[in-house]
Amino acid sequence: KICYIINMNKPRYLPIGIQTFEKIRVDNAVYVDKTSFVESLVRNGKPYFLIRPRRFGKSLFLSNLRSYFEGRKDLFEGLAISKTETEWKQYPVFYFDFNVGDFTTEENFRASLGLKLDSYEKIYGPRNLNANSLADRFSDLLKSAHEKTGLQAVVLVDEYDKPLLNAIDDQNLVDAFRKILKTFYGVLKGEDAHIQFVFITGVTRFDKVSIFS
């Protein structure tokens, strides 16, 4: 486990444009403490969907959640949650950031998402050769992560709708992306027994994209 030392002697600055909680804390940048909300969310249930405009702080808050569920106690020193959290468990965290990726074609999108799954398969076990679809691979990963760690998985998705918005001028591509995402996100419902927490962000209301049942 890597432990970073927060440099309290370093001049503080406003972290404009920085969306990574770890960098803000390590650099001792100005941070508005929202960790009490993290504790409340974790305690009160799943899943959560945050639909807000861009530049609203969604990515930073998701990064905050990621650090918490990865058990990064060192990054929360002096913050509200450090006074009440005692366990700091290291959950298996699946983090999907759709702010980045190649969404120019269906093939490129599948490949981009597949590479992300590849990285998790290296951590939680080899790919099941019988799992042909992205959804099947994701389903297997949630199960194997639970079995390997003894803890249910945490799934964090940033800008869930970005692929659809990028393809907005090509209806055929939108339909193809919607089909991929609908089956992929459908895994979250089917594998609920292996999931501890889900938090999804985006800018589009779910009833406008038809990918969640």
Task: Give residue ranges: language-model regions.
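Phosphate-binding site recognition
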Residues: 1-213
